[in-house]
Structure formats: C-alpha cells, structure tokens
C-alpha cells in the first residue's frame, strides 16, 4: 500500500535522523531580550523630541486625537531606528476578515536622482496606506471594480521588526467609503464604547474623571506539533487542516499521562526558540506545558490591553508556525485535527479596568460588601444572558463545530460559572440582601513539612464556557485557530450595553432622591432575577444540563449555521449600531462572509475527502480484496474448501465505501441558492456523507 510505504519511510527517517535541535537564549537574559524588536515607549522616548513624545504618549494612554503635525517626526525616528536594526522595508499590517494577517512590503529606498539612493519614510506613509480592498472578503461592501481601501496607523499598538528586515506597523483597514473591512476597527470601537459606559458607572461611585477604562485579554493557545514528514504524507491535513480518515490508535489519551508531563526534548527546543522570537516582539508569554492529547501543547501570555493582545495573538500564531518549520515540525491550530482525542481551544481570559481603579472584576476578600464589583460583575452576567446567541456566533466556524459540545470543550450552551462564593452572594442578593461571603480558608495537606495552602473560596469548573476565575472571566469556547478579536468585540459591546442600562437606572434613581446603595441593591436583585438562569455551576458535559438548559430557555446552537443567525437579529443589529461598533451594513457583511467561509471550508473537505477515498483508500481495498480472492481460489484449486468470510466482509465494506463515495460526490455537486442555502446543504448533506465515507474506510 502506498500510504503504508510513505508512513514507513517517514518513521525510518525520523528514527534515523539527528537528535533534537537545541536552542537557548544565546546567553541573553529574557528581560534584556524582551521588546528589542519593538518601537515601544523606551525607544520612542530615546528617539523622539520631548514634546513629540509627550503628544504621542497622550494619544496612546488617553485616547486623544493624534496630532498630524508630529507624523513626519515620528516616521523619521521610526525609520532610523528600524534601519539601524537592519530593516530595509516597511509594511502596514492589518487583519482582514479572513482571520489571518495581511501585509504589503515597501522599501525605504528612494533614488536620489544622481545614481545613488537614500532612505525615506514620510508621515503620510506612516499614517495611511492604500491596499486593494476588492481582493479581501467584504460581504458585498466592495465590488470587484471598487478596489480602493485604506489602512490607518493604530498608534496604540507598537510597531515592530519582523524577520529582521521589515518594520511592521499595525493598522486598521477600511473601505473608500469608511466601512470596516477588518477585525481591528470594530475592536477599537467596542473598547471605546466600554470605556464611555464604564466611566458613567464609576462616576456614580464618586470617581471624578477616572482614567480611561481598558478591556484586557490573555489567550491560552493550544496547538499540536506533527513531524513534517508525517504531515506531508497526509493530503487531508495539508488541505483541510484535519485528518478526514484514520482509525483510533491503540493508545490515545486514556492514561491521562501526557497532560503536564515532562516536555520532550525536541519539543522543548522548539518552545524555547519560539519564546525567544516572541520575547523580541514584546509578547509576554508566561507558561508552556503538555496538553491532554498526545502531541498537544499550550503557550499562554500575561494579560494585555485587548487591542494589543489581539495583535499579539495573531503574531503568536504566525511565529508558532514559522519556528515549527525550523525544527522539522508543522504546527496545527485546527480545532479538531484528529478524531478520538481532544482538539485545540484558545481560552480567552477577560477583564477590564485601569491603573487608578485597578481591575474592576476584583472582588476582594468580602465581595458581598464590594458594591462596585457586584455592579460590574452583574453587568457581565446580564450581557452573557441577553446576548448568548451572539457570543456563540462570535466563535462559530466549521472547525470549531467539531470541538464544541464534546467531552473536551464547553458545550455550545452559553452559561456563566461564578463559583461557590459569588453564587452564594448573588443568591443572597436575590433573596433580599447579601450579608456575608464564604471565606477562603487554608488547606492542610497532612504532611508536617508542607506548608498550609491558601484555599480559594470556590472550585474551578472546566466544563463551563464562561467561568469566573478569581478576578476575571475565562471564555473557553474560542477555537484554537481563531482570532480573539471577534469574541472581544462582542464582550466589550454587550457589557457596554449592560453598563449603559445600569448607569441609566442608577442615575435616574439618585436624581429622584433614592440613596445610591438602596438603588444598587434593588437593581442587582432585579438583574439576578431576570438573568440568573444563565448561571450554572454544575457539569456542563452532562446530558442533565442540556435538559435543564432547555427548561431555562437557554439557546443550544449546535452548529455554525444555527449560531450565525444571531447576526441578523434586530436586537443585535441595534446593539452594534447604537454603540457605533458596526453599522447594519458592516454587520450583514460579516454574516455573509462567515457563512461563505463555512461553505468553503466544508467544500475543501468534500473535495479532498473524495479524492483520497477514490485514489488511495479504494484502490488499496480492491488490492486487498483481490489478494483474498486469489488466496481463496488457490485453496479451492488445492481441493479444499476456502473460508471466504474475510472476503465477503471486505466485499461488503467496499460496497459501502463505493456507495459512500458516490453520495459524497453527489452532495458536493450541489449548486445554487443563497449562501445560507449552501451552508445548510453543507451541514445537512455534505458533512454526513463525509462521515459515512470515513466510517466505511
């Protein structure tokens, strides 16, 4: 069999190959390496005049409008710094609706007219670029002949040097008509909306002119590493990102021995190399470890501003793939590359606050007495409850559908885990008023030489899609290969709407003469009474929870096609329009784009699945059938009665495979109708046909 030969060659090559590539920090301490390729605050201060630096810093920290007069000075300083570090080109980096990174490189070099050249970078080139807007997904916003689009410098996300020769400038990407064609623009708008509404609430608590409120994020990235020789032997992995065929291995993850196990030397060398590259880019990766499935690992950073965290997450995925090639690996970010073992998610840790008031989701030791925390926490609960379908839509994709709802990832039902302490506090509020908080206490292990451990007031719940974990919420349903900007846009905007609701109610109550504390207690009780059904502290994997969620009226949107319908709901359209995050046209364009991406992803799987089944699996099965038939004939010619059970079973299976291939080809030939019709056909016809072929193979 061809497949077996290729596999044997791959195994032999790996076994006979060199040992793991060793990597170190080249003798440079991590803190000295950190940010060396970033034009961050220290470099700005060193290269810019004081007044220009102060003006730029004010824009970055306070959200003030950028002064166009300083653009040329900043551009020149940025160019000089980049050239001194070996850069020859610059690029406006943006994040189109493909979910990937886009960039076009332009040289600093300009002919001087006398046979020589000089380097040049103007303020205009820094602030604005003009890529072709018709060649990216636009969902109808741009026609093929309407090509003009603009990139605009995002001053809040620092420029950096990538691969030693290109100055990369993070930018927003909009059409000639000003409509957002990317993931950064609505994220920045949503952060602005959250800030405005959070400021209103803080002022009610006596904070006059509080600093800008920023949402923070940190994404725990799971991934698989596969030797490149195995990867290129699998056309399905190459084209679809996941294996469409394959038997369950004799040993998978059932021994639970891979999670947090000793990191293999070759993998550790890769991790160290990857971290070194990320440190240079100013990305504060913190943890690394084995994940649950064989060949699966995780890297996680420290919290950053949501905008920078989103940019950095794109860089993390790019760097992971690049560095993997150096070590003979391929890095897989698909949510479910292998059936039968865990897939890869990206837990997004989320909070918001500022340097003055701190983390607004910090409960303190006595959360029942922390009215400010309870108000902001209740805003999050209300947001998840009211816009659960939208939150589910924000992480919808063909690949993530394979992961959600299995006993490895949270279900598609959006619920909130609060933990014992907070659940008890909110139960008290609903009953008439919170009087106490469960204490944290200490844990004695029973060994004299081991210290007493501070014990948290509640357990963790890994089955919850949206869990409170001490001073932040963790959104666990995000897929391993997805941009985190989509979920962050939804969280920022939905929470802004809840804070708007709360601020409006409290402002009116105070103006009418009601004491603030009494108004808060009354409003919190109302919010929990109306939205407490979204709180669930139990086992999200259990069938009982699915039945209970249905009783509570919580939506269970199992597929992307079901989930994306939320983007067309009037209340969602109104939400994004009211807070100037997405216009109705911009929102509808995303609905069309995400449906189209779903259709295209499954179409690729259908095509490569059909090809593999017809050209690799079926021929091998027919050869095996012939060998069995020839063996039976030889036994019969010897005057004996052959046992044909194996031949009959293989013949039956070949029949199932042949009919399955025909059904898969027929399903793939479907054309016509709207994008929604095509998506439904892919869900209802193509995917079942593909699974049938896999089972037969």
Where are the model-predicted features located?
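Active-site core of metal-dependent hydrolases
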Residues: 33-146
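Gly-rich Lys/Arg/Thr-decorated short loops/hinges at beta-loop-alpha junctions or inter-strand turns
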Residues: 29-40, 59-61, 178, 250-259
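N-terminal hydrophobic targeting/anchoring segments and the immediately downstream early-domain regions
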Residues: 1-27, 144-152, 156-161, 166
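Flexible inter-domain linker/hinge segments
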Residues: 10-15, 24-44, 192, 196, ...
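Glycine-rich, acidic/polar active-site loops that bind/position phosphate-bearing ligands
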Residues: 147-333, 338-594
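Anion (oxyanion) recognition and catalysis
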Residues: 60, 112, 279, 321, ...
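C-terminal amphipathic alpha-helical interaction region
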Residues: 527-697
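Short linear, low-complexity motifs centered on an aromatic residue
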Residues: 99-115, 134, 139, 234-236, ...
């Amino acid at each position: 069999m061809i497949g077996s030969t290729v596999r044997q060659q791959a195994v032999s090559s790996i076994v006979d190959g060199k040992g793991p590539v060793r990597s170190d920090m080249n003798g440079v301490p991590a803190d000295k390496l950190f940010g060396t390729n970033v034009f961050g605050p220290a470099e700005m201060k060193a290269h810019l005049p004081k007044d220009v630096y102060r003006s730029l810093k004010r824009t970055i920290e306070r959200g003030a409008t950028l002064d166009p007069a300083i653009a040329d000075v900043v551009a020149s300083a940025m160019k000089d710094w980049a050239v001194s570090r070996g850069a020859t080109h610059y690029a406006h980096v943006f994040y189109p609706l493909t979910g990937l990174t886009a960039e076009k490189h332009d040289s600093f070099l300009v002919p001087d007219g006398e046979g020589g050249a000089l380097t040049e970078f103007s303020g205009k080139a820094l602030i604005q670029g003009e890529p072709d807007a018709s060649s990216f997904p636009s969902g109808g916003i741009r026609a093929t002949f309407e090509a003009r689009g603009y990139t605009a410098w995002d001053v809040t996300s620092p420029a950096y040097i990538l691969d030693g020769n290109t100055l990369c400038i993070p930018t927003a990407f909009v059409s000639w008509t000003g409509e957002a064609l990317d993931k950064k623009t609505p994220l920045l708008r949503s952060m602005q909306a959250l800030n405005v509404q959070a400021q209103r609430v803080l002022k009610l608590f006596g904070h006059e002119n509080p600093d800008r409120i920023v949402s923070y994020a940190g994404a725990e990235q799971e991934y698989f590493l596969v030797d490149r020789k195995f990867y290129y032997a699998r056309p399905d992995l190459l084209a679809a990102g996941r294996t469409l065929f394959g038997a369950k291995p004799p040993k998978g993850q059932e021994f639970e021995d891979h999670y947090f196990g000793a990191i293999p030397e070759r993998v550790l060398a890769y991790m160290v190399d990857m971290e070194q590259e990320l440190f240079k880019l100013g990305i504060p990766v913190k943890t690394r470890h084995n994940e649950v499935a064989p060949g699966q690992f995780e890297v996680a950073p420290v919290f950053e501003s949501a905008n920078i965290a989103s940019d950095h997450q794109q860089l993390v995925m790019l760097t992971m793939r690049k560095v993997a090639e150096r070590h003979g690996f391929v890095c897989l970010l698909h949510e479910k590359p292998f059936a039968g073992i865990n897939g890869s998610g990206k837990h997004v840790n989320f909070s918001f606050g500022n340097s003055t008031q701190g983390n607004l989701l910090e409960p303190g030791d006595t959360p029942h007495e922390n009215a400010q925390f309870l108000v902001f926490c209740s805003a999050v609960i209300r947001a998840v409850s009211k816009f659960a379908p939208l939150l589910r839509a924000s992480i919808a994709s063909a690949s993530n559908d394979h992961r959600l709802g299995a006993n490895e990832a949270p279900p598609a039902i959006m619920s909130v885990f609060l933990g014992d302490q907070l659940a008890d506090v909110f139960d008290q509020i609903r009953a008439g008023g919170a009087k106490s908080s469960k204490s944290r206490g200490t844990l004695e292990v029973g060994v004299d030489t081991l210290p007493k451990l501070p014990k948290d007031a509640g357990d963790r719940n890994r089955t919850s899609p949206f869990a409170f974990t001490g001073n932040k919420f963790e959104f666990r349903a995000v897929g391993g290969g997805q941009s985190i900007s989509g979920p962050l846009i939804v969280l920022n905007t939905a929470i802004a709407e809840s804070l708007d609701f709360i601020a409006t109610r409290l402002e009116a109550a105070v103006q009418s003469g009601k004491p603030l504390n009494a108004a808060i207690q009354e409003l919190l009780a109302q919010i929990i009474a109306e939205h407490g059904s979204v709180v669930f502290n139990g086992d999200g994997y259990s069938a009982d929870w699915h039945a209970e969620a249905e009783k509570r009226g919580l939506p269970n949107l199992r597929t992307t096609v079901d989930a994306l319908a939320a983007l067309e709901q009037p209340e969602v359209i109104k939400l994004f329009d009211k807070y100037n995050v997405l216009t109705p046209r911009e929102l509808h364009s995303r609905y069309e784009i995400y449906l189209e991406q779903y259709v295209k992803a499954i179409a690729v799987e259908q095509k490569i699945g059909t090809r593999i089944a017809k050209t690799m699996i079926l021929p091998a099965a027919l050869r095996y059938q012939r060998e069995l038939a020839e063996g039976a004939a030889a036994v019969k010619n010897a005057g004996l009665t052959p046992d044909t059970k194996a031949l009959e079973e293989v013949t039956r299976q070949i029949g199932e495979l042949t009919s399955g291939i025909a059904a898969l080809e027929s399903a793939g030939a479907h054309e016509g109708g709207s994008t929604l019709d095509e998506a439904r056909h892919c869900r209802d016809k193509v995917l079942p046909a593909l699974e049938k072929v896999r089972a037969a193979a």
